[in-house]
Amino acid sequence: MTSESTSPPVVPPLHSPKSPVWPTFPFHREGSRVWERGGVPPRDLPSPLPTKRTRTYSATARASAGPVFKGVCKQFSRSQGHGFITPENGSEDIFVHVSDIEGEYVPVEGDEVTYKMCPIPPKNQKFQAVEVVLTQLAPHTPHETWSGQVVGS
């Protein structure tokens, strides 16, 4: 009988100076076979595409059951993923996140909208617009679809 070890051989990690990826915990473990770039990992990675936010059922149900308000888009930045709506009743501007906008167009200043309101956690003292629908596009203003096509002049 031979006395061979039953553990697999130790293989050093692969290194590729051209690899743009620097995996971080939990993906990069000592002895793992990942390609890594020498030096410091990048810190300013672009955020992923915006998607619908996950809210608790109770928060979603409360917002959906609430009244519909009207307002006008004051400002919206697609690159930052948020903007503000001026309520029709003249109260304080309401925050709107890109994930809460329904429909195919990116809002621009002057677009008329309808929306419902949801408290902003953790203190729930301020509100944000949810279920935002563009009801009237601002006249004589080009609009962009979420896919990037420009419509109007």
From Swiss-Prot:
Bias-annotated ranges (Basic and acidic residues): 27-36
Domain of life according to the entry: Eukaryota
InterPro entries for the chain: Ca-reg_mRNA-binding_domain, CSD, CSD_CS, CSP_DNA-bd, NA-bd_OB-fold
GO molecular function term, any single one: RNA binding
Residue positions where Phosphoserine is found in the record: S19
UniProt xrefs under CDD domains: CSP_CDS (cd04458)
Any Pfam family hit: CSD
Cellular-component GO terms for this entry: cytoplasm; nucleus
GO biological process, one term: regulation of mRNA stability
Protein name according to UniProt: Cold shock domain-containing protein C2
Organism: Homo sapiens (Human)
Lineage: Eukaryota, Metazoa, Chordata, Craniata, Vertebrata
Encoding gene, per UniProt annotation: CSDC2
